[in-house]
Amino acid sequence: MNNQSLSLIETLSRDAATAAQTLAVLDEQTKNTVLLDMAKSLRASTAEILAANQQDLTRAEEDNLGSAMLDRLLLTPERIEAMAQGIETIVSLPDPVGITRDLSERPNGIKIRKMRIPLGVVCMIYEARPNVTADAGALCFKSGNAVVLRGGKEALQSSLVIAKVLQAVLQQHKLPKALITVIPDPDRGLMMELMQQRAYIDVIIPRGGEGLINFVTDNSKIPVIQHFKGVCHLYVDKDADLDNAMALLLNGKTQRTGVCNALEGLIVHQDVAEAFLSKAAVELASHKVKINACSRAAKYFTGCTVLDDSEFGQEYLDLEIAIRIVDDFDHAIDHIRAFGSHHTEVISTKNDATAMRFQRTVDASVVMVNASSRFSDGGELGLGAEIGIATSKLHAYGPMGLESLTAEKYLVNGTGQVRS
């Protein structure tokens, strides 16, 4: 790192802030036209993107990165198509910018409304997630924000090529390429400098492991929206349909392990523990899932690791799960309160009152009843491609789509009133 590099960070941040002023007043039709062209260009550039991704994968394998990281890093024609479709979904969503709502008319005749406006410049700091480059670029563009992207070294080549494709479309439409900016050097010192650019950047959204989130939160001078780890639980209630509960368990744990909405914990009411866990032992073994369990649950599994209380709450991101038998509903809630990460929690039950109590009581950004944790995703919830899942409650909570990338300002209209 040198002074020239530091100057580059400030220049890129300033250029993004300047570009954001242009985008803030762009009409929805123009935005949608640009986004559709971005989707087309991603498809047309599939071979180039895959070649860059292969460079990242080769380096990752040489560095012995884990299977979860490799899965997040991997791009395929199908995943690139999903990125393009995600952008097209964003096109179909209403533009939140400029939407107003009436609040009141005061006794003195002034009228008060609120209008949605862009945040300004959003900075994304993320690890081995090349899809974030396209998702964040498109979401920020539609919501009127410039975005500065600082990806990890693991996905650098993929991110640079994806950004180049999107920037080319911007320039074709006579828009500044600084609307989607990628920091070309993953040096950690440059990331520190980026987090000091509060004169130009309005919010930072980190996506990655626990270490990255804590580092950004501790060192940023810019407000941070945390997207923390996903320690998601399935609670099998005493009134659960056990076949449905099994489907939720297998889908949540085995469909795709290296994502934040995968199940990491299974909590089972003692009244159904024998019936459910006896079958779960067979099903999980067939999927080669490693079992970690409390002493009460361990007897149902061969070769499992017995956990004490301090060892729950891990984000495995692999074919591995922690299992606990609880005495009752309150015991389940206590476990989630102690070991959950405010991401996604699931209950399997046929009891409507219990389901409602679970949704009202559990402190998580998404609370599912009889539905897989894997639906905790912006696309699945109808938001289009998400910028992440916020686990801190300030400004946004849960999957962040277009509206979450805006704020509201007051509009006050009068006829010459003055305050006495």
Swiss-Prot record:
Entry's EC annotation: 1.2.1.41
Organism: Shewanella denitrificans (strain OS217 / ATCC BAA-1090 / DSM 15013)
InterPro entries reported for this sequence: Ald_DH/histidinol_DH (IPR016161), Ald_DH_C (IPR016163), Ald_DH_N (IPR016162), Aldehyde_DH_dom (IPR015590), G-glutamylP_reductase_CS (IPR020593), Glu-5-SA_DH (IPR012134), GPR_dom (IPR000965)
Pfam families: Aldedh (PF00171)
Catalysed transformations (reactions): L-glutamate 5-semialdehyde + phosphate + NADP(+) = L-glutamyl 5-phosphate + NADPH + H(+)
NCBIfam families to which the protein is assigned, alphabetical: PRK00197.1 (NF001221), proA (TIGR00407)
SUPFAM superfamilies: ALDH-like
Pathway(s): Amino-acid biosynthesis; L-proline biosynthesis; L-glutamate 5-semialdehyde from L-glutamate: step 2/2
GO cellular component, one term: cytoplasm
Entry function: Catalyzes the NADPH-dependent reduction of L-glutamate 5-phosphate into L-glutamate 5-semialdehyde and phosphate. The product spontaneously undergoes cyclization to form 1-pyrroline-5-carboxylate.
Protein name: Gamma-glutamyl phosphate reductase
Classification via PANTHER family: DELTA-1-PYRROLINE-5-CARBOXYLATE SYNTHASE (PTHR11063:SF8), GLUTAMATE SEMIALDEHYDE DEHYDROGENASE (PTHR11063)
GO MF annotation: an example: glutamate-5-semialdehyde dehydrogenase activity
Subcellular location: Cytoplasm
Gene Ontology process terms (BP): L-proline biosynthetic process
Family assignment from sequence similarity: Belongs to the gamma-glutamyl phosphate reductase family.
Predominant location: cytoplasm
Key words of the record: Amino-acid biosynthesis, Cytoplasm, NADP, Oxidoreductase, Proline biosynthesis
